[in-house]
Amino acid sequence: MPAHAIAAKPSDRFVNTEPVEPMTRSRSDAAEAAAQVPGAAGVLLEALRWRGSTARQIGLPAKLWCADFMNFVLRRAGGKGTQSRAARSFLDYGKKLDGPRVGAIAIFYRKGLNSGHVGVVRGTDGQGNPIVVSGNHGHTVMQATYPKSKVLAYVMPPNYVLEEMAAAARAAALKN
């Protein structure tokens, strides 16, 4: 172990002492940048830009707005959503995936035949539970871990599936 690590208090060993640069990008600049990122990464980046925002701040209805937020994010990232206010409308949207994938849309079960929740997958925890950025979690856009047992489906927006396939084909062609 380096001498400076041994001499430091355990709580100080991993402290970042580098100066932090303030972010000066506006949300419109960030949205423009996210729209230029190919595939599902653009959807995730756009969702992340709105963390901490309320429905009112975004301009969405204040009740049951997770699907509204998902459609909003898809539009801002250059895609097209379901245009429905129902979270479960995303069950019939895009290409179904066999598991969580960064940038995929996760649809969750909630009590009631037509109830649900929807958001963008950011990753998974150590037990395979999806970490999702969604609207109307605690009345804001928030990142949270959801139980994998509540997942109804993971889907990828249709145009992003094609973009990712094309990107994979280009990458394979460059290797040859």
Each predicted region: which residue ranges?
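N-terminal capping segments
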Residues: 6-82, 91-92, 168-176
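Aromatic- and glycine-rich peptidoglycan recognition patches
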Residues: 10-12, 94, 121-176
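...with weaker cross-activation on analogous glycine-rich loops/strands in unrelated enzymes
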Residues: 41-44, 79-142
